[in-house]
Design a protein with these regions (language model features):
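Ubiquitin-like/PB1-type beta-grasp interaction modules and other compact soluble beta-rich domains
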Residues: 1-88
């Protein structure tokens, strides 16, 4: 089993039009690194040049905003659902 990651419409061109993908990782940072290996270019759309999540991107683990947990160090495990949501 893996972690389900919901991809917003603006980033789907990088995932071959997939709205949901599966990936692995111990935390959000690991997860994003692994996603970027499979779908190059996605990380630079989510993170700024300092390595921080862009201000207009929100990431949720099981509907909990990672900004209020541990940010990039927020733990994830098999069966979790991660949503990447750009602010409107």
């Amino acid at each position: 089993m893996a972690i389900r990651v919901r991809i917003p419409t603006p980033l789907r061109k990088l995932t071959g039009d997939k709205g949901e993908i599966e990936a692995k990782g111990a935390n959000i940072s690991d997860l994003m690194e692994n996603i970027n290996k499979t779908y190059p270019g996605i990380k630079e759309r989510i993170y700024d040049e300092t390595g921080e999540i862009r201000r207009f991107i929100n990431i949720y683990v099981n509907e909990e905003d990672i900004r209020f947990i541990d940010g990039n160090k927020t733990a994830v495990r098999d069966g979790d659902e991660v949503s990447i949501i750009p602010a409107i």
